[in-house]
């Protein structure tokens, strides 16, 4: 599902041109719709906003864990990146929920795993390593376009900025917070991503 919203210019003409171009270029699963009625527009946006709740409530032991959920890539690489994400999940024995903000190149990617299953946990780690490598090297992207580095992406930060810039960032943090009292482990941590969850006993996705 792709929602495109216009707020300037000859909106009717622009929308018609976009629909024709998309319908010509891609095999659509259903006919494209142009909605001018505010009630219909609101209904379509409700579908978009329901994606995340729907994904995380999927039944079964495998849940949509958010450990690779906020990548951003150059906009002209988005189609290739989407294909990569679908294939990445498949090659690691699962499927994934994918949604996001395509105009920004920002994707929310949530593969389904059960981290309390040792084999699934190994798959999660392998997927994360391949994801990080491809995102940074092949797609020239970054691990977070919206949600921030936090704890879950902290170990990837040195690979994003390089040792020199990362070192400067750490020294600034240490100068302002020498005792490490402010948000310990956030952004600057060598620990594996999964330790930030404080254990993997919970089956509730994050």
Over which residues does each language-model region extend?
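Noncatalytic alpha-helical scaffold of FAD-dependent oxidoreductases
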Residues: 1-145, 150-206
């Amino acid at each position: 599902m792709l929602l495109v919203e216009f707020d300037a210019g000859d909106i009717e003409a622009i929308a018609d041109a976009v629909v024709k171009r998309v319908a010509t270029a891609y095999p659509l699963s259903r006919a494209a719709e142009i909605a001018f009625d505010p009630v219909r527009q609101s209904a379509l946006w409700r579908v978009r906003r329901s994606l995340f709740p729907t994904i995380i409530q999927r039944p079964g032991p495998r849940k949509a864990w958010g450990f690779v959920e906020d990548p951003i890539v150059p906009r002209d690489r988005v189609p290739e990146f989407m294909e990569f994400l679908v294939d990445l999940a498949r090659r690691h024995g699962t499927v994934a929920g994918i949604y996001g903000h395509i105009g920004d190149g920002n994707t929310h990617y949530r593969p389904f795993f059960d981290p309390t299953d040792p084999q699934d946990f190994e798959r999660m780690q392998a997927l994360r390593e391949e994801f990080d490598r491809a995102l940074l090297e092949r797609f020239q992207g970054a691990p977070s376009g919206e949600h921030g580095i936090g704890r879950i992406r902290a170990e990837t930060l040195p690979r994003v900025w390089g040792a020199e810039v990362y070192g400067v960032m750490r020294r600034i943090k240490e100068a302002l917070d020498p005792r490490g009292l402010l948000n310990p482990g956030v952004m600057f941590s060598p620990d594996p991503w999964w330790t930030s969850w404080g254990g993997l006993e919970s089956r509730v996705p994050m």
